Structure formats: structure tokens, C-alpha cells
Design a protein with these regions (language model features):
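Bacterial Sec signal peptide processing site at the extreme N-terminus
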Residues: 18-37
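Beta-alpha junction/loop-to-helix N-cap segments that form part of ligand/metal-binding clefts
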Residues: 106, 281-286, 296, 300-362
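Extended repeat-based interaction scaffolds and adjacent low-complexity, acidic/S/T/P-biased segments
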Residues: 147, 159, 163-265, 324
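Extracellular/periplasmic periplasmic-binding protein-like sensory domains
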Residues: 449-451, 472-474, 490-566
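Segments of small-molecule ligand-sensing domains
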Residues: 546-617
């Protein structure tokens, strides 16, 4: 089975790259058994990232070699198969590998790290932690220690322990010493990891100077503040350097923070939102979130805002042109999906647009238009990825009848099957009803069990004392439901003997309002959601807790849209950066944000569990590669430069060799 390349998280890709550093050459006597031209060919394939070909060659040469070279080459082949995405090939070699000699600790350590990395890929964090013991000593070569700490960083991150993940990255940074290129990548990932923590957590846990971690945490807080003016950020960084004068942060890294902030600034922003019609309340929530973020900037640095009514679809292009004539340097909106589609058809777009929705056709593209929305499709795909990482293979799908349920089910199914998972059964329920026993029985094959028992009773001519059984081949249920229906569906699934099946669902299951009594029936459900909704922090002026005092609506059904409004404002200074640097992410209220090659913004969300009626964060979605959907409708020359033949990978800079 080949691992889909999108399954590689940023840190795990870093681990695989570090294998190249940690693949220690055999001693001279062992190396002499391998012809120089063969070693040269293997190294060339590895340098060119032709991992599949390199792994096949290594395995072939190993089969023709004698011990101890045979074992060394088999191990390198197993590592390279995993780089190529072929876990089963790697495992088949691991199972027959033993250290060629008892006095080769490096071989045994590499084998243990490889087993760990496979456990991480499978989502078996407990096994991965067991394999990490014992930790390497000072005598262990630095490349192997780097690999160990990269593994630990990923294990902690997937467990939701971002601070400990950052500590491991800090150790890696110190171990790299004079390798400035790799240190820049590690430092970027370190600050991004800390920036995903809440402001409250950063402030409470930050140690004072001269602590290295304290310095990184303060830098992360500066990054999160979204300081608008480069001069102000330069002053803040200078003050930071005075406080942490011996901190290992590279000057090149600090300079990169300044460069990003200076990439884009607009003094005049036009906001296109409907002021009447069915989307008025949605628009109001987005607008209020946008304004809340705008008010956080000092008065002298706030851009001019001008609002335009976009209620009438037919006026979309005229309103855009009117905004430009009145001096707009950036346009935010429209909200209507059809209006976004109209703008995408424009041949010339003089000023950039941050649209507040995403069109159905994922390949429609304009280099000056960015699409941002709370797409349930992103959630469905991340659920598929999480379930796969946790080792599940057989899925059941239960969604409401209608367009919304169809779209979510289809996106989950496509992503799940792309990863290699199987959909055993897919059923729909009528959301206007309260009794869902019929679709549930079909989903769980209980209706077939009933039919078999009735047929047997007819054959025997007597009533049988038997219990209907649900199917036993399913690993989990993917469920899409609004809060009220979710509270009805979960007990009914339990009644039909599915209480032990894990249930994964989208954010729609959670109202966003803490209600232990009503949500008690949602026990043992895992879902993805906006971090801002789940994190209870008081130190940040833009936290939900603080904004709710000023805007009561923040606590209602449109809460996630306030977060979207905040991110919409803060994104404006980062769009060019995200476009120019594929793989870059920024920490937002709606999640960790990144841009794909079609200028569609994606969100990496928080994972939460419902226990005793209360939602609590358990971790964060893995940083996957950016999805690609074929060629854009615009000419290829209009696309931003991307690696790998234009296929933008959603990998942090730390993953680049």
C-alpha cells in the first residue's frame, strides 16, 4: 500500500529528510564491498528525490550482498521506501532485519527510529512513545539525535502538546550549530508551533529572560499580534533582542519577519457585503469581526474602510469598479458564491480581492483573487485524514439528505478512498424527522440480520429467541449533523448497538454554546472546529470571551463568522507572502491558514472530544500537503512559482531538503 503523499505532516517530512543525514555510512571495510559507481548512482537518485527508484536499487543490491553490507543496505532501502510513500515495502524489510553485529548501536537506533516513524504515520502515538525509549546519549552521533528529537516533536504535536513539541525543535536548533540553512527552517517551524498556542498559555507559561524558550515564546506572541507597520515591528524586535541578547534566533530569521510584514499594505480597503437579503446576518457577523480586528491597530495606522452593498448579484462587477474608482487598493468580499464566480471570470483585475466564499469549481483561478471561506469540505477531508492516521480502514457514512449533506459526504468519500480507505455503507437521513431507526438499521446491516432471522423462523416454523446484530466489519462512522439532530442520532446509534464505534463529525455538531445538559448525549464524538471557539483565553483582546462583552452575538450561532471576519482583516497583510512562499502558514482564529496554488485558503482545525456534555481540545489537524486539482483555467505562466512542477506542497519550509 502506498501512502498518499498528502499524508506527510511537516514534521514527519522533516524526519524523513533527516534520515538522509542520519543514514550513517558503513565503516570503510564494509563500504569497500559496494562498488563506487553503484553508491554514486544511489546517492544521485536520493539527491534528485527519486526515492522509489533509489529504494528499489538499494534492495536489489542488498539481495546480492553479504553481511554486514546486506543489512546496512536493507535498512537504507527500508528508510527510502518510506520516503517514497510505500509503508508496506518498508515493513517487509524491517521484519527480517537484525543488527549485523551486536556492537553496532547506530544500526539498532536507526531501526528503532524507523519503526517509530511508521507508528507515527499510522497514528499509533502510544506505540511511538514506547519505541522512543531509551533516549540517545551524548555519544550518539548528532544526525541520529536530530532524528530522535524530530520524532519527539511530532509525537508531542499530534498529542496536542505544542509547548513540548517546540522544546524538541529548540533542541534540534541547538544541535544544528553552524548549519544556518536548516536552522532557519527549524526556527520558522518552532515559532509557528508556538504561535498555534493561545495568548493566555504563552503568557502564563513563558519563562523570563535569558531563557531560550522564553525568547521563542515572546517572538511567537509578536508574530500573533499582526503588527501592521514594519517600523513598529522593527522597534518591537529590537526591544526583544535587548531582553534576550544571547538568544540563538538567527538575524536572518528576524529579518524575514520584517520582510513578510512589509510585503503588503493597503491604505484604502473596500468591503463588499450584503446589507439586506438572506445573507444579511452572516454579513453582519463577518463585518463586526473585521472591525474588531481593525480597531486593534493604533489609530494612525488604520487603513480607510469603505463599505459597499453587494445584495444584488447583478451589480457585482459594477460595485467592484466603483470601489476602484473611489481609491480602493484592496477589496474584501463579496460573500455570495455566484458573485465570486463572476469576479473570477474577469480578464483584468486591477486590485486584489479577498473573496469571502469559495466557488464549487476548485480549478477556477485568478492570480489577483483569493478565496476564503468556512468550507465544510475542508472539515470532511481533515476528518478522513485523522481517521486514516488513527489506523482506521473501513468507514460508514451517515449524512442528511440534501445538497449540504451530499457535498460533505462526497468530499469525505473522495478523500477517504484516495488515502486507501473503504466505504462499506453510505446512508442518508431525513433531518425533518426524529426517528432515524430505518437509515441506521440499513447503515449497520441490522435490517439484513432481521431478514435472516425471519427467514430462519419461517423455515423452522417457530419463533426464535435471538438478538439482531450489527455489522462487525466497520471501524468508525462519519456523521454530519446539526446540534439538535446530533443529540438525537447519537443515542439512537447507541440503541442499535453502535455505541462502541468511534464517531467523527464536522463542526456543525457543536452549537458553540456551552450546554452540558443538552450536549450530554453527544458523548464519545470527535469533531473538528475553529480553535477560537474552543479556546478560552482572556489575555487576547480578540478572544471570544472578551469580544462577547462588547458583541453579544459572538456567543450565538454566527460565532465562527466573527472569527472569519477577524482573520479576513489580518490576512490582508499576508496574502502576498502566502502566495510568494508556497508552504507558508499563518496562525488565525479560524485555524492555521495556508494558500493552495489556486489561491484558495485552507484551514487546519482543532480536534475536540465531547465528554460529559463539554467540548475540549485534544489536538490539531496534521499539516498536510496542499490539495491539487489539475491545471488552473488561467495560463500556467500566471501561476506563482511552485516546486515539483507546479504542484504546491503544503509543507513548512523545514521540510525542504
Amino acid at each position: 500500500m502506498q501512502i498518499n503523499r498528502r499524508l506527510a505532516t511537516a514534521l514527519l517530512m522533516l524526519i524523513l529528510i533527516l534520515q538522509g543525514c542520519a543514514t550513517l555510512k558503513p565503516d570503510r571495510q564494509t563500504e569497500a564491498q559496494l562498488l563506487p559507481e553503484i553508491r554514486e548512482k544511489i546517492d544521485l537518485l536520493l539527491t534528485n528525490e527519486s526515492f522509489e527508484a533509489a529504494a528499489a536499487l538499494l534492495q536489489t543490491v542488498a539481495q546480492q550482498s553479504e553481511s554486514p553490507l546486506r543489512e546496512q543496505l536493507y535498512l537504507e532501502a527500508a528508510e527510502t521506501w518510506l520516503k517514497a510513500g510505500y509503508m508496506e515495502n518498508s515493513l517487509s524489510l524491517i521484519d527480517k532485519l537484525q543488527p549485523p553485529t551486536s556492537d553496532d548501536p547506530a544500526f539498532a537506533f536507526r531501526l528503532r527510529m524507523l519503526r517509530t516513524e511508521i507508528a507515527i504515520l499510522r497514528g499509533d502515538i502510544e506505540q511511538a512513545l514506547d519505541l522512543m525509549e531509551p533516549s540517545p546519549g551524548e555519544e550518539t552521533p548528532i544526525p541520529l539525535r536530530l532524528r530522535y528529537h524530530a520524532n519527539m516533536a511530532e509525537i508531542f504535536r499530534l498529542s496536542g502538546n505544542l509547548l513540548e513539541s517546540a522544546r524538541e525543535l529548540n533542541v534540534m536548533d541547538l544541535l544544528l550549530a553552524d548549519d544556518e540553512v536548516q536552522r532557519l527552517e527549524i526556527q520558522e517551524l518552532l515559532v509557528q508551533t508556538l504561535a498555534s498556542m493561545t495568548d493566555t498559555a504563552l503568557q502564563l507559561l513563558q519563562p523570563p529572560p535569558p531563557s531560550n524558550m522564553g525568547g521563542w515564546m515572546e517572538l511567537a506572541r509578536l508574530v500573533k499580534q499582526q503588527i501592521a507597520q514594519p517600523a513598529d515591528l522593527a522597534t518591537a524586535l529590537a526591544t526583544w533582542r535587548e531582553r534576550f541578547s544571547d538568544h540563538p534566533a538567527l538575524q536572518a530569521f528576524l529579518a524575514s519577519l520584517l520582510e513578510r510584514r512589509g510585503l503588503s499594505s493597503s491604505d484604502h480597503i473596500a468591503i463588499l457585503l450584503p446589507q439586506s437579503g438572506p445573507y444579511k446576518n452572516v454579513a453582519t457577523a463577518v463585518r463586526d469581526g473585521f472591525m474588531a480586528a481593525w480597531y486593534q491597530h493604533p489609530l494612525e495606522y488604520r487603513p480607510q474602510l469603505r463599505f459597499y452593498d453587494s445584495s444584488k448579484l447583478e451589480d457585482t462587477l459594477r460595485t467592484y469598479q466603483q470601489a476602484l474608482l473611489q481609491g480602493a487598493q484592496m477589496v474584501v468580499g463579496p460573500l455570495n458564491k455566484n458573485a465570486v464566480n463572476m469576479l473570477l471570470q474577469m480578464e483584468t483585475m486591477q486590485q486584489p480581492v479577498l473573496a469571502l466564499n469559495q466557488v464549487e469549481d476548485k480549478t477556477l483561478y485568478h492570480p489577483n483573487l483569493f478565496q476564503f471561506g468556512l468550507a465544510p469540505e475542508d472539515e470532511a477531508e481533515q476528518i478522513a485524514e485523522r481517521a486514516w492516521l488513527e489506523g482506521h480502514q473501513q468507514a460508514l457514512i451517515l449524512t442528511p439528505a440534501g445538497g449540504w449533506g451530499d457535498r460533505i459526504a462526497e468530499n469525505f468519500r473522495l478523500r477517504w478512498q484516495t488515502l486507501g480507505g473503504a466505504v462499506l455503507e453510505q446512508r442518508q437521513y431525513n433531518a425533518s424527522e426524529n426517528d432515524f431507526s430505518h437509515p441506521i438499521r440499513q447503515l449497520l446491516n441490522i435490517d439484513e440480520s432481521q431478514a435472516r432471522i425471519r427467514a430462519l423462523e419461517q423455515l423452522l416454523g417457530k419463533k426464535l429467541e435471538s438478538e439482531f446484530r450489527r455489522r462487525q466489519d466497520a471501524d468508525f462512522i462519519f456523521l454530519a449533523a446539526r446540534p439538535q439532530k446530533g443529540r438525537q442520532l447519537r443515542p439512537q446509534l447507541r440503541f442499535h448497538h453502535a455505541g462502541s464505534l468511534p464517531i467523527y463529525t464536522t463542526s456543525h455538531i457543536y452549537s458553540g454554546v456551552k450546554d452540558d445538559e443538552k450536549d450530554r448525549d453527544l458523548g464519545r464524538i470527535s469533531f473538528v472546529d475553529t480553535p477560537w471557539l474552543l479556546e478560552d483565553e482572556t489575555q487576547n483582546n480578540l478572544s471570544r470571551t472578551n469580544l462577547q462583552r462588547l458583541m453579544p452575538g459572538v456567543g450565538g450561532q454566527y460565532a465562527r463568522l466573527y472569527a472569519m471576519g477577524i482573520d479576513s482583516y489580518n490576512l490582508l497583510a499576508s496574502l502576498q507572502q502566502l502566495q510568494a512562499q508556497p508552504g507558508r502558514t499563518i496562525s488565525g482564529k479560524t485555524g492555521t491558514l495556508y494558500l493552495d496554488r489556486y489561491n484558495r485558503l485552507h484551514r487546519l482545525l482543532a480536534w475536540a472530544d465531547m465528554k460529559a456534555g463539554s467540548a475540549s481540545i485534544t489536538g490539531y489537524a496534521p499539516r498536510m500537503q496542499t490539495p491539487t486539482f489539475g491545471q488552473p483555467t488561467q495560463s500556467e505562466s500566471a501561476l506563482p512559482n511552485t516546486p515539483n512542477g507546479g504542484q504546491t506542497q503544503f509543507l513548512d519550509q523545514a521540510t525542504k531538503p
